[in-house]
Swiss-Prot record:
Protein's UniProt name: Protein SIEVE ELEMENT OCCLUSION C
Transmembrane annotation, as ranges: none
InterPro entries linked to this entry: SEO_C, SEO_N, SEOA
Organism this protein belongs to: Arabidopsis thaliana (Mouse-ear cress)
UniProt record, GO biological process: phloem development
Amino acid sequence: MNFRRDISALNEDIIVEQLLRSHDPDGRWLDSEMLLQEVETILSFVLQNDVSRPLLTENCITTIEVFDSKETLPYAIFRISVQMLCPCTGENEIRKRTMVLFDLLKEYRWDAKAVLVLGVLAATYGGLLLPVHLAICDPVAASIAKLNQLPIERTKFRPWLESLNLLIKAMVDVTKCIIKFEKIPFKQAKLDNNILGETLSNIYLTTYRVVKSALTCMQQIPYFKQTQQAKKSRKTAAELSIESRRAAGELSSLGYQLLNIHTRLNKQVEDCSTQIEEEINQRLRNINIETHQDNQDVLHLLFSLQDDLPLQQYSRQISITEVQDKVTLLLLSKPPVEPLFFLLQQLYDHPSNTNTEQNYEIIWVPIPSSQKWTDEEKEIFDFYSNSLPWISVRQPWLMSSTILNFFKQEWHYKDNEAMLVVIDSNGRFVNMNAMDMVLIWGVKAYPFSVSREDELWKEHGWSINLLLDGIHPTFEGREICIFGSENLDWIDEFVSLARKIQNLGFQLELIYLSNQRRDERAMEESSILFSPTLQQLFWLRLESIERSKLKRIVIEPSKPDRVFEEVRNLLDFDYGKHRGWGIIGNGSTAETVDGEKMTERMRKIVRWGEYAKGLGFTEAIEIAAEKPCELSHTAVVPFEEALTMKVVTCEKCKWPMKRFVAYQ
């Protein structure tokens, strides 16, 4: 018994040596998991007994490519099938042909070798069994089966079909183990050499057995047809029965061998994966304090459990090296989230954008609410990842739970709250959440560090630009009045007064941005700018300003901050207590006025009539807030000089003065 075991081990060592000599990967990459899913779908459908069951999958085969290779997937399948369909007589020829296949597949990784061979098996047996499978309910399929001399009655070859089904399931299961092993990021962590060496040896041998078993299945195609040809054959029923049992037995034997291998290999792969994840988890804890040469180590670690092409931009699959030497913004969010669209506008559609955007990249990392992605969430992700201009994680549902837990526990990611983690070109974490910063300033915030945010707040105070920059064009000198209310009577009065003031010659733009939406047509008829999108972005922007300022107030609680107070008052505005609010300014300035006081002052401006011409709206509102002088005052101005003056104001109260012509 020990002698036999030694001989078997010696043979396995020889096989491994031969396999390694024929293994020369050139960097080409195939989505083995997706292709295996299609293979499993095809074979499980044609091998099932219930014809009425629908095919519960969408066709993804057209999206599968062989990357970094001139060889297309269909051509690779064809090239392999030519060798697999050649007849082999005896075990020795099958072994030799198996090694020929490995020479043919030398440029591919181990998981791709196994999956491509199974792809040939699915294409061949799928084409043979599909007409047989559908013949009961489809006359055309029955005719095709007869023309190809295929047996329509499944009972005649059911034992063989069951054995084939057993073997195919076993091959698929062990191939999943190979794929899982190939996805383990050994570059990011170290594994015990003995454990790794033993597992690698089993991966090689298992791949060999999958290829050899698939080749054996292909060699039994003539038997599959012989039940239909039995009437023309001289073989007796007994002889056919013996051949049937022999063929089924051969497939069953291979299937049980692979099932036993699967149990051992699956445990080994799980152990390797667990050890690597534990070490990666330890590295993640130190990721903020480690020194890096660039951002590649950090990004490879964060997306370590993905394949060589873990990212995508639109439908193009890309590697992490494409964001080297750039500032990287990791956008963590549910798919989708409202700030995504504002972020898109601020970083890509903002009028002030220049070539700065070439120096940074956004990588969207969608995180679902539950541990398992729903079909709806996958569809939403596919739509937005193929529509939005930034990079996204490809197949985020395959991300490691270790990484996701790290985001939630160490980075404090919360559901329904998108966050934007900034990694500079040297791999340093310069801002653990730049979301509010980007929503406020867009590309002006580059390089999106905490220190840059402090600089921006020193440069910007309370102004119309701060409120509207990036969501509505503001020009220095043009006066804007933003107003809001839930009182329809007050809004109508405000709009009526504003139109009268505009008729006096005041250049004034009105923007309605209350929390309550009004009829859009009615607002347009009143010459009022109203946009539900602008309304949504305005309040989203205010919330971002509040959060950004709040972080600084926590650091310096005793220092007064006008911006924070003004924004907080707007967000907490009591529409039941007050009729409305207004903010007036000309770009670099802004003044907030209570709604009741606003209309009261506007009525004064209307009463002034032409005497207010020459004043700006903001200036007129400020003057109207002052009480007029109790005593009458007179200012004598030469006639020619008065012709050039648009308005004359009282030196004491600043109210506009009526004009009279006096003759001396």
